[in-house]
């Protein structure tokens, strides 16, 4: 797992994600990913708990990308430290 408490690593990822998704093509790709990963749908599948877990994982990918798009590297590092995600 990537160490999101390391500011140097986070700055690099932040730069790459923003370079990718803050373009017209990147925004179109994000819209596609949101639709494909069920971003706007409930993750709960009352008939299949494994499907709920899969749905949550798909949405986690989008949430992570959006976190990098909507927050500064410093904010991301602070959030990771708060969650204790430094030893991945």
Language model segments and positions:
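Intrinsic-disorder/low-complexity detector
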Residues: 1-88
């Amino acid at each position: 797992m990537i160490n999101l408490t390391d500011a140097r690593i986070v700055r690099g990822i932040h730069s790459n994600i923003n370079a990718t998704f803050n373009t017209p093509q990147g925004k179109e790709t994000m819209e596609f990913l949101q639709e494909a990963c069920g971003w706007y749908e409930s993750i709960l599948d009352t008939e299949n708990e494994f499907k709920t877990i899969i749905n949550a994982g798909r949405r986690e990918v989008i949430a992570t990308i959006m976190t990098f798009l909507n927050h500064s590297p410093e904010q991301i590092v602070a959030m990771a430290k708060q969650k204790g995600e430094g030893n991945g």
